[in-house]
């Protein structure tokens, strides 16, 4: 059969993370996900990208996690917004939105969201 070369990059290298985060943000804004969120959630207070796409360690099985803060006392709801048919170099990427109100969220989940990137609005982090 012959020899086959296997080439890969060091995915843990800082350069990959720093460039990939900026690339992921560009793909989020180009994909019109924010418009879909506004049609699904009325009057969001803040829209935050969190999880693997925020950290830059997403892979071919990762989904896009976006948190949406709303006013009120509603329990956390996770809605599958759909799949993005073409999202950068990937196809059929699932997008989930986590709708939460400040008064009814687990503190560990909120800490994860607070370390995300605010795409729109203002996320107030208070003790």
Where do the protein language model's features map onto the residues?
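Catalytic core of pol beta-like nucleotidyltransferases
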Residues: 1-43, 55-61, 70-127
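Short helix-loop-helix/strand-helix junction enriched in hydrophobic and basic residues
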Residues: 46-53
